[in-house]
Amino acid sequence: MKAKDLRQKSVQELKELLAKLREELRVLNTLYINKRPFNYGRRRQIKRDIARILTVLRERNEA
């Protein structure tokens, strides 16, 4: 997900997407802790997407 696309979304949409990604990350982290097979690349991408969303939300709060 690109930051440019995120900037076009409303704050409510960003918060909903953030909650969804955090839940997905929680599930992947559980698999990681239990040494189950999962997609490492997806885990990394989710963490980056969460960081991008938080960055966009902070930009809007400062503006």
Swiss-Prot record:
Coiled-coil boundaries: none
Record bears the keyword DNA damage: no
Keyword terms: Ribonucleoprotein, Ribosomal protein
One Gene Ontology MF term: structural constituent of ribosome
Family annotation (SUPFAM superfamilies): Ribosomal protein L29 (L29p)
GO cellular component term of the entry, any: ribonucleoprotein complex
Domain of life, per lineage: Archaea
GO biological process: translation
Gene3D superfamilies xref list: 1.10.287.310
Pfam families per UniProt: Ribosomal_L29 (PF00831)
NCBIfam families: L29
UniProt similarity note: Belongs to the universal ribosomal protein uL29 family.
Name of the protein in question: Large ribosomal subunit protein uL29
Gene that produces this protein: rpl29
